[in-house]
């Protein structure tokens, strides 16, 4: 099993997932991730300081406001937001973080489509947080056709690997 697959398996084994970056303005990849986690039986928490609810579920301004500590955090927001959220993960003792990147785990290919921040990745690693720096849970959690194809293409192109 590849390192990424092992990390994904560990992340998806968690039960309570905070999803940072949901939006009420339009359908987004983050919204799709939230709904995919929820439909697969996870306890999910929407996080965005600009909105109060998402699809009838409460939306929280930050991780500290959640009713319980999440087991894992999925971030699909700007790298600047990712830096702040990872600081909260450190404070709360969250041990699993996934930073989204549309282009696999090589965000240099399309810096505008990534939540990956080198500072956030480093902060995770320094604090014993398992971090997946790129890709998308929708490629692994009962993927639809498009996400299955992205996973296959990024895998063939070497864009699904993780460096320690």
Each model region followed by its residue ranges:
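Mid-chain, well-packed structural core segment of small domains
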Residues: 71-114
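Conserved beta-strand elements of the Class I
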Residues: 18-20
């Amino acid at each position: 099993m590849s390192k990424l697959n092992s990390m994904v398996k560990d992340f998806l084994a968690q039960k309570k997932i905070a999803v940072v970056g949901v939006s009420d303005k339009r359908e987004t990849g983050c919204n799709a991730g939230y709904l995919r986690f929820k439909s697969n039986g996870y306890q999910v928490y929407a996080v965005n300081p600009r909105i109060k609810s998402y699809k009838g579920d409460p939306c929280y301004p930050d991780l500290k406001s959640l009713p319980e500590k999440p087991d894992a955090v999925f971030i699909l927001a700007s790298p600047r937001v990712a830096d702040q959220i990872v600081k909260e993960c450190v404070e709360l003792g969250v041990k699993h973080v996934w930073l989204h990147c549309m282009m696999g785990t090589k965000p240099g290919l399309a810096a505008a489509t990534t939540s990956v921040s080198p500072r956030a990745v480093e902060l995770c690693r320094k604090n014993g947080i398992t971090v997946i720096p790129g890709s998308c849970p929708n490629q692994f959690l009962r993927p639809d056709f498009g996400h299955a194809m992205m996973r296959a293409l990024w895998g063939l192109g070497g864009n699904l690997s993780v460096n320690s």
